[in-house]
């Protein structure tokens, strides 16, 4: 049977030591917060207070140091390599920036990732990367990122980059932001809320419907932050591709239940995260 590849996304992995911790619990993907300084340089992998219930909000690294740790965890011949870690979502905390700094943020982000993660195109980390942007007005971050990789001689690395607007905006508004950014694929659509609060699945279902329609812009849908078995089952029943969680082992447990193991499998590196799954 054709099973939907599933991404178990470890939430708020902001210290290098947490990469091992979350992957060992079953995550094949992690989400990392990126804060910016006043000149739009990516500065720390830091969330800050408040954050999810039951989590420490203040773990951090310098962004470039984190990229090096992540590179080691995703480079096949490295002693820190995790074969199953195949995707990272950078949750870009651009709320501290003016709208007109978005292009610069994208440019500086690209330079950091190119140097410290991709090793300037020389046997760097292999994980796919989703740039997750909280504000539709900051779509030029994507433009800045793309133009910088191109001008720095590595346009091919855009094959490894996907996109997400994480503000729970109306699906139509997200579509027009992508149009402005010139994005025509590699789209992950998030929906969710902190684990301290409850959120229904109506917008998730709308995103799934867009993904599965012939003219939708979405390739993958993920839901955050899910820590309980019941809400995991509800999200899987709604047809999501990814679940972001503080407890990867809980999601892995549910995926191993017979009802779900018949329909889902844990995604591997061979699963293209930019491809819409067709049943």
Curated annotation (Swiss-Prot):
Mg(2+) binds at residues 31, 33, 91. Signal peptide: none annotated. InterPro entries: PLC-like_Pdiesterase_TIM-brl. One of its GO terms (cellular component) is extracellular region. It holds the Pfam family GDPD_2. Binds 1 Mg(2+) ion per subunit. SUPFAM superfamilies: PLC-like phosphodiesterases (SSF51695). It is found in: Secreted. Keywords: Cytolysis, Dermonecrotic toxin, Disulfide bond, Hemolysis, Lipid degradation, Lipid metabolism, Lyase, Magnesium, Metal-binding, Secreted, Toxin. It comes from the Eukaryota. One of its GO terms (molecular function) is lyase activity. It catalyses: an N-(acyl)-sphingosylphosphocholine = an N-(acyl)-sphingosyl-1,3-cyclic phosphate + choline; an N-(acyl)-sphingosylphosphoethanolamine = an N-(acyl)-sphingosyl-1,3-cyclic phosphate + ethanolamine; a 1-acyl-sn-glycero-3-phosphocholine = a 1-acyl-sn-glycero-2,3-cyclic phosphate + choline; a 1-acyl-sn-glycero-3-phosphoethanolamine = a 1-acyl-sn-glycero-2,3-cyclic phosphate + ethanolamine. Its main location: secreted. Dermonecrotic toxins cleave the phosphodiester linkage between the phosphate and headgroup of certain phospholipids (sphingolipid and lysolipid substrates), forming an alcohol (often choline) and a cyclic phosphate. This toxin acts on sphingomyelin (SM) with high activity (about 30.5-31.5 U/mg). It may also act on ceramide phosphoethanolamine (CPE), lysophosphatidylcholine (LPC) and lysophosphatidylethanolamine (LPE), but not on lysophosphatidylserine (LPS), and lysophosphatidylglycerol (LPG). Belongs to the arthropod phospholipase D family. Class II subfamily. Class IIa sub-subfamily. This is Dermonecrotic toxin LbSicTox-alphaIB1a. It comes from Loxosceles boneti. The lineage of its organism: Eukaryota, Metazoa, Ecdysozoa, Arthropoda, Chelicerata.
């Amino acid at each position: 049977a054709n099973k939907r590849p599933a991404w178990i996304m470890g939430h708020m992995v902001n210290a290098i030591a947490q990469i091992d911790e979350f992957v060992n619990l079953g995550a094949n993907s992690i989400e990392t917060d990126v804060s910016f300084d006043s000149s739009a340089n990516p500065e720390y992998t830091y969330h800050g207070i408040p954050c999810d219930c039951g989590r420490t909000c203040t773990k951090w690294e310098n962004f470039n140091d984190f990229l090096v740790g992540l590179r080691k965890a995703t480079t096949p011949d490295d002693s820190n390599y995790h074969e199953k870690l195949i995707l990272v979502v950078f949750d870009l905390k651009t709320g501290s920036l003016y709208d007109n700094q978005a292009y610069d943020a994208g440019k500086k982000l690209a330079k950091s990732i190119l140097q410290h993660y991709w090793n300037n195109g020389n046997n760097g980390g292999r994980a796919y990367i989703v740039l997750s942007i909280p504000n539709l007005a900051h779509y030029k971050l994507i433009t800045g990122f793309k133009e910088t990789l191109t001008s720095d001689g590595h346009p091919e690395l855009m094959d490894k980059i996907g996109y997400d607007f994480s503000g729970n905006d109306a699906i139509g508004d997200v579509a027009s932001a992508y149009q402005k950014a010139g994005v025509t694929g590699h789209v992950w659509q998030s929906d969710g809320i902190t684990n301290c609060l409850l959120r229904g699945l109506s917008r998730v279902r709308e995103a799934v419907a867009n993904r599965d329609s012939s003219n939708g812009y979405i390739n993958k849908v993920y839901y955050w932050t899910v820590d309980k078995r019941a809400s995991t089952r509800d999200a899987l029943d709604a047809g999501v591709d990814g679940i972001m969680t503080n407890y990867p082992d809980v999601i892995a447990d549910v995926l191993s239940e017979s009802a779900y193991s018949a329909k889902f499998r844990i995604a591997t590196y061979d699963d293209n995260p930019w491809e819409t799954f067709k049943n």
